[in-house]
């Protein structure tokens, strides 16, 4: 890996971050707050939240088996995606490399930040080659994006190829593990010390059932996290989100129950879906969704919309012609989908 200073945009490295009132307050006991020009009358949301989300990070750390200083919390994982561009990529100069197809926000954030986005197609099994990704890089490649389990394909990427990339690439490797709670594959969180160029994304939106509160997690070395903290907005995670996340962390046993139930439903739904006349193939999945190749994705999608059932038509993206992405719902929801498709005339 190149020196972190060399990878970071010079203006970001030299940046003196904005210091909010609560940044300067070290968390000692206090009962009178006259530092932030807040309304003193309790609503009870009159006070700014902890800008560093200390309570939340201290609860996440033992669950994820990491140091709190290696955690960044953002307004959804999309904030962390945007931050890696703003921190490390010089607009109009640097580039990033990503597998294709994958999560669309990697490219959206590249376009917003005027960074060249280079795609490397997966093979017919939706796997990637580290050598092919490396061949797409040059001296101005700052980031490589991987998503495992991948969205929209659903499968885990080959760990050996991921490790080879981490060992070889001189920039930063982002591994998005948004769906890892549904997979038996070990997380890369345990390898943060081994790979200083590794950034891992996770989220509260999937297994934790908290998509509405918009809370994403990034894990990396303390040095990388400190750069994120320099350039994030002062109060990027609001108090209501922090409170809801703390409450969910106290109920983490429910997440395990939800995941078990969803995996059982995934098996049932896939086994029945593959028998439908309109289904040509279901690709292997390690997530809470599956990708199905069907006879006519657009026609079936519109048919389901007419029945009040929404799936995702992925036919317009690479390697997904006539494919629908189907999220695993509750048993009654899944039964409604199956019943509708059994009545569909191919």
UniProtKB/Swiss-Prot annotation:
It holds the Pfam family Aminotran_1_2. The gene is hisC. Homodimer. GO terms for molecular function: histidinol-phosphate transaminase activity; pyridoxal phosphate binding. The lineage of its organism: Bacteria, Pseudomonadati, Bacteroidota, Bacteroidia, Bacteroidales. It comes from Phocaeicola vulgatus (strain ATCC 8482 / DSM 1447 / JCM 5826 / CCUG 4940 / NBRC 14291 / NCTC 11154). It catalyses: L-histidinol phosphate + 2-oxoglutarate = 3-(imidazol-4-yl)-2-oxopropyl phosphate + L-glutamate. PANTHER family: HISTIDINOL-PHOSPHATE AMINOTRANSFERASE (PTHR42885:SF2), HISTIDINOL-PHOSPHATE AMINOTRANSFERASE-RELATED (PTHR42885). This is Histidinol-phosphate aminotransferase. The modification N6-(pyridoxal phosphate)lysine is found at residue 206.
């Amino acid at each position: 890996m190149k020196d972190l200073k060399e990878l970071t945009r010079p203006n970001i490295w030299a940046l003196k971050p904005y210091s909010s009132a609560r940044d300067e307050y070290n968390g000692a006991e206090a009962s009178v707050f006259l530092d932030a020009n807040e309304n003193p009358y309790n609503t009870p949301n009159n006070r700014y939240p902890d800008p560093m989300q200390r309570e939340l990070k201290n609860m996440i750390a033992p669950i994820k088996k990491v140091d709190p200083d290696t955690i960044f919390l953002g307004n959804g994982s999309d904030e962390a995606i945007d931050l890696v561009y703003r921190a490390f990529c010089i607009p109009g100069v640097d580039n990033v490399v990503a597998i294709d197809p994958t999560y669309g926000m990697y490219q959206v954030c590249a376009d917003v930040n005027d960074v060249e986005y280079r795609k490397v197609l997966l093979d017919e099994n939706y796997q990637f080659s580290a050598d092919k990704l490396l061949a797409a890089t040059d001296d101005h490649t700052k980031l490589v994006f991987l998503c495992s389990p991948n969205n929209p394909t659903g499968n885990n990427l080959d760990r050996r190829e991921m490790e080879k990339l981490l060992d070889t690439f001189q920039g930063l490797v982002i591994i998005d593990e948004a769906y890892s709670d549904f997979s038996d594959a070990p997380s890369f969180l345990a390898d943060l010390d081994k790979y200083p160029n590794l950034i891992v994304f996770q989220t509260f939106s999937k297994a934790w059932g908290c998509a509405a509160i918009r809370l994403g997690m990034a894990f990396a070395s303390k040095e990388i996290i400190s750069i994120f903290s320099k350039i994030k907005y002062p109060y990027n995670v609001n108090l209501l989100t922090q409170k809801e996340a703390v409450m969910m962390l106290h109920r983490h046993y429910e997440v395990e129950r939800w995941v078990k139930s969803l995996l059982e439903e995934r098996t049932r739904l896939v086994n029945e879906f593959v028998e439908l006349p309109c289904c040509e193939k279901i690709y292997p999945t390690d997530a809470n969704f599956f990708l199905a190749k069907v006879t006519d994705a657009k026609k079936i999608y519109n048919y389901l919309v007419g029945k009040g059932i929404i799936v995702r038509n992925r036919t317009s993206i690479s390697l997904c012609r006539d494919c629908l992405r189907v999220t695993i719902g509750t048993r009654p929801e899944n039964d409604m989908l199956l019943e509708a498709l059994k009545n569909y005339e191919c």
